[in-house]
Amino acid sequence: MTLFIDGDALPNILKPILLRSVERLKIPTKVIANKKIHIGDSPCIEMIIVSQGADRADDMIIELLSPEDLVITADIPLADRVITAGGHAIDHRGTRYSSDNIKHYLAMRNLFESIRESGEITNGPKPFTQKDAHAFANQLSAFLQRLEKRKK
């Protein structure tokens, strides 16, 4: 399994959580973004910088993705592509996307996008909190524990 991190908008508070997991389990990790994102120093982490442009990082993740890989992203359309390709996706707030729920999240995202495009003023996402970081850490840990059990 490879861990992919969609580097766009990755909260800094998650970087040490990710680094600890990567180092503890020696998980091959690719951070993909259009600028350098420093997660931490580890031989397990590779930084891939893509050119500027819509969905360039997303396209690179999908190109490199294998079934069962895990992608960390807050990008719901990317999560949908990951699930469709047989991968797994967790967002920054600890939501684990699956084939059972991704279409719901995508529909909600598209609904709110169309409301915003119509000129309606909507609230943006809630500020990222320590509680969100904790939920993310728990979901990542649970996913990695299931993975370790399957290896045995």
Curated annotation (Swiss-Prot):
Signal peptide region: none
Recorded superkingdom: Bacteria
Matching Pfam families: DUF188
Cystine connections: none
Classification via PANTHER family: UPF0178 PROTEIN YAII
Cross-referenced InterPro entries: UPF0178
Transmembrane segments: none
Name of the protein in its database record: UPF0178 protein NIS_0137
Family of the protein in this entry: Belongs to the UPF0178 family.
